Structure formats: structure tokens, C-alpha cells
């Protein structure tokens, strides 16, 4: 999810991309396992948009695992993004851009490649968009993969089922398939990665160098993929930008929410049949997102894709042993403002008195700013540190803190999602709040994109200064500000106290 708050607290509007120079006449044809496709030459790249990686999850296929695409033999033009998955348009406009056409037939991906030919063996970067698992689209201009592709990567962006169409159960579904799948959106992501394994070499990619990366709910998805036995072996590197430490949902809670959803659309709650639930128009379900009857933000624990709570999987060391970059932003908690949450009230709900919180942040006088600072550290910074500690015992792990306050940034720091246009290299297209990118913004964009590409290519985020991996989670951070600065023991005392208070610590070593 993107918030990138301005000083007036307004969310980024969608970054409209400049029209690329497009040619279809000379675009190469790629033969996928499902059939031949032809993209478009955009400037110096070949781009394939709207490629189906799974069959339409409609009718009887709603709330089922993604199914294979029906093969085709006639050349398929792949020059237009596919429909976005059902969502509430107003939320999407505030969190990344207009999703365009919305339809339940939405399981599409896009491929950006500098060399659409088998045997090129380029690193592959698979982007998973954020949006609290209830909105967003892989086809948004903000997520255009061209800049990373020009560095030499094959970039894939994708859609996955959202909201109650993507993460759902109900008494009738539990009876239909006891213990069956409930995290359909995550299964979509896994299906997309399986498509990558099967097809990406034809687009110039190296199937042995696949990195998954995402922001917010996309970062949470990256960690869930690392934790999921169903995704084992489908990728070799991971980047999680601002994942959050919110707990997942149990199947029991999710089923109760499913009953509430049925009731909200006029069906008899827990007694509703699956036939009746599958006949509900998708837009009626999307209209409920962001309300109390919506799950929002987290996965459901207890199916084959998410057998255990995410943090528990990492605590047991059962996650994929792949190199990881993980980090957070200096004003991540500003995202709560989009949902009408008062940071001061949220601080009180944490169960800590103002004086206790004030001791953490003696220089902050305003309760609203105290709430934002505490929310940032509890929801994002401490969680990233905890995951770093746990994963660094298994694989190289690098942690960052994005503090650059550039275009559209708020006075309290870099908002939730502020790093995304720097990573994707779309800052030039973003006339966010009418402010053009500065030379400093472009320098940060270049450094960050170079590091992410280097990680995908080599397994190490090499750059102008050495970024040490955080051996056993001791608190080493790369502060990505106007310059890159390595900070040892970053916020250690405060974060240790938070981790202990949240009972994430587990051992003394985790707090050191």
C-alpha cells in the first residue's frame, strides 16, 4: 500500500506514466506453455501485458485454487494490461492509483524484458503489490518495471485475488472442503511463480535467479511465500518493504467474518449455501472492504498455504533459506490516517500510558506525533528487526530504514510506500502533488534501484558503500536518506523493549 503523505496529509495520487514509444511491428513472438504471445516494443524494451497465468476464478471457481489456463493456438496480442481484481475503487485511488477496468477475471501478469529470447539468462524480479490485501493492481503505472528491466532484469508484475474473494472462509465452505484452502490470493501468487518457473526462460529470464519483492501487503506476501511449503523452491531471493507485525486470523474468526459478510449482503449468515455465496456480485463484496465485516491486512492461518502463523514459522526456522532484504520507513504509521484512525487514540489502545510512551520519544510533544512514532516502531520497525534476527540465523539478511523525504513526503518523514517509486524507477513520471523530482530524488532512485537489481543478480545488495548483513539481528541498518549511511545498533534499546513487550523475543539473544 502506498501512502506517501504530504505535509497536508493528502495521499499520493496515481503516478501517471509518460506515454512510451510503442511499436508492434517488430516485437518478437514468445511461445509460452499456453500459447504464442506478442508484446510491444516500448522504447528499448519488449513488454508483454495482460498475460493470463491462471483461469478466470469465476462461477464455480470462486473460492477455489487457481486452475490452469485453457491453451490457445492463435497468436495472442499482449499489449494491454488485464483487468484488476475486484476492489473498492475509492481505496485504490488513495493507495496507489486508479485500478482501471475491474473484473473477477483478473489473474494476469506483465513481463518487462530487455531481451525476449531464450538463453539470455537474466535475473528475474517478481513484484507483488500492496494494498492491505484489499486493493491494488500489478498493472499500475507506479509499478512499471521498465527501469529495473533496463538494468538487465526480467521484471514481472502481477494481480492476485483481493479482499473476501481472495481470503475467505465460511461454514458452508468448511463443509464443502474441510481444512481446504482459504488464502486464495496467496495461492494466486504461487500460481504466478509456477508460471514464471515454466515460462520465464522464453522471455530471457533465468529460472534459478528469481527474486520476489513487494511492499506492505506485498511485503507480507513475500514473507508468507517464504513461510509457505507450497512455494518452496520457486524463488531464490526475497525483498520485503515495510511488512507489518499484525497477527493473522484463525479459521474460526475468518468463518465468523464470512457469516457476517453473508448477512451483510442479505443471505442467512452462517446458514448461507455456497451456491448462494458464489452468486453474489463481486462488486457487492468489494463494497464491504475496509468495514468491520472485512478481514483486511492479514492471512488466515490453517490451510496448506499458511499452516502456521507467520512469525511462528520464522521462530521455528521453517521458512525458505533464501537471502532477504527487509526494512521499514521513517513514517510508516502515517498509513493509518487513510483509514480514519486517530494515532493518539491508537497509542492508548496499545495499553501503554502516555508517560511510558513519552519516555521512548522525549523530544516529541504532540500526542498525534507520539502515536505515529509508536505505531511506526510497533507495527513496522520492531517487526522488521525481529524477522531479521530470526532469518539471519538461517540466511544472509540485510535491514534498511528509508528516511529520504523527497517528493510528496510528510513533515514527519518518509511515508508508508514512499520508497516504491525510487525502487521501481518511476519517480520521473510522478508529478506527485505537482512537485517534479529533484536531482537528489533521482540520485536516491538510482542508488536504490541499483542495489535492488544487484541483489537480484548476485544475492548481495552491492552499492557505493558496503551494506553489512545483519548477522544474528544485532541491529545493523542501512539508513537510506539523502545519502546511504550504515548505522549499528539502530534504535536498539527502544526496539528491544517493544519486542519484549510484544512477547516476540523468545530469548535473551534476540534482544541484544
Question: Where do the PLM segments sit?
Answer:
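Bacterial N-terminal signal peptides
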Residues: 10-20
Amino acid at each position: 500500500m502506498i501512502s506517501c503523505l504530504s505535509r497536508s496529509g493528502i495521499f499520493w495520487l496515481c503516478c501517471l506514466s509518460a506515454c512510451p514509444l510503442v511499436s508492434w511491428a517488430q516485437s518478437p513472438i514468445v511461445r509460452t506453455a499456453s500459447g504464442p504471445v506478442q508484446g510491444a516494443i516500448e522504447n528499448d524494451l519488449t513488454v508483454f501485458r495482460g498475460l493470463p497465468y491462471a483461469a478466470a476464478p469465476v462461477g464455480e471457481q470462486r473460492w477455489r485454487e487457481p486452475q490452469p489456463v485453457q491453451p490457445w493456438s492463435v497468436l495472442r496480442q499482449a499489449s494491454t494490461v488485464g483487468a484488476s481484481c475486484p476492489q473498492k475503487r475509492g481505496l485504490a485511488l488513495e493507495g496507489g492509483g486508479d485500478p482501471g477496468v475491474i473484473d473477477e477475471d483478473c489473474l494476469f501478469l506483465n513481463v518487462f524484458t530487455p531481451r525476449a529470447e531464450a538463453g539470455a539468462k537474466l535475473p528475474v524480479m517478481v513484484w507483488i503489490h500492496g494494498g492491505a490485501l484489499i486493493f491494488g493492481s500489478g498493472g499500475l503505472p507506479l509499478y512499471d518495471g521498465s527501469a529495473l528491466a533496463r538494468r538487465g532484469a526480467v521484471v514481472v508484475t502481477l494481480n492476485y485475488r483481493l479482499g473476501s474473494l481472495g481470503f475467505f472462509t465460511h461454514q458452508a465452505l468448511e463443509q464443502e472442503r474441510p481444512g481446504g484452502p482459504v488464502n486464495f490470493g496467496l495461492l494466486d501468487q504461487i500460481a504466478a511463480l509456477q508460471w514464471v518457473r515454466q515460462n520465464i526462460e522464453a522471455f530471457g529470464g533465468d529460472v534459478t535467479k528469481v527474486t520476489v519483492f513487494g511492499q506492505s501487503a506485498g511485503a507480507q506476501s513475500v514473507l508468507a511465500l517464504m513461510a509457505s511449503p507450497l512455494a518452496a523452491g520457486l524463488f531464490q531471493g526475497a525483498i520485503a518493504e515495510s511488512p507489518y507485525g499484525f497477527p493473522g486470523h484463525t479459521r474460526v474468526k475468518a468463518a465468523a467474518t464470512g457469516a457476517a459478510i453473508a448477512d451483510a449482503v442479505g443471505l442467512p449468515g452462517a446458514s448461507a449455501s455456497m451456491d448462494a455465496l458464489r452468486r453474489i456480485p463481486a462488486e457487492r463484496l468489494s463494497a464491504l472492504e475496509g468495514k468491520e465485516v472485512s478481514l483486511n491486512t492479514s492471512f488466515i492461518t490453517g490451510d496448506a498455504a499458511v499452516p502456521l502463523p507467520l512469525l511462528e514459522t520464522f521462530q521455528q526456522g521453517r521458512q525458505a533459506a533464501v537471502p532477504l532484504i527487509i526494512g521499514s520507513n521513517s513514517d510508516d504509521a502515517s498509513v493509518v490516517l487513510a483509514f480514519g484512525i486517530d494515532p493518539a487514540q491508537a497509542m492508548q489502545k496499545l495499553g501503554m500510558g502516555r508517560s511510558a510512551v513519552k519516555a521512548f520519544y522525549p523530544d516529541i510533544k504532540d500526542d498525534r506525533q507520539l502515536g505515529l512514532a509508536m505505531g511506526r516502531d510497533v507495527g513496522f520497525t520492531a517487526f522488521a528487526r525481529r524477522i531479521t534476527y530470526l532469518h539471519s540465523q538461517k540466511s544472509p539478511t540485510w535491514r534498511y530504514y528509508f528516511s529520504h523525504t523527497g517528493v510528496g513526503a510528510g513533515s514527519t518523514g518518509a511515508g508508508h510506500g514512499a520508497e516504491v517509486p525510487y525502487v521501481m524507477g518511476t519517480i520521473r513520471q510522478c508529478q506527485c502533488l505537482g512537485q517534479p523530482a529533484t536531482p537528489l530524488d533521482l540520485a536516491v532512485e538510482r542508488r536504490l534501484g541499483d542495489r535492488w537489481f544487484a541483489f537480484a543478480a548476485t544475492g548481495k545488495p552491492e552499492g557505493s558503500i558496503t551494506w553489512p548483513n545483519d548477522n544474528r539481528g544485532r541491529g545493523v541498518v542501512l539508513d537510506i536518506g539523502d545519502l546511504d549511511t550504515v548505522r549499528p545498533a539502530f534504535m536498539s534499546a527502544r526496539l528491544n523493549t517493544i519486542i519484549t513487550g510484544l512477547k516476540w523475543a523468545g530469548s535473551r539473544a534476540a534482544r541484544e
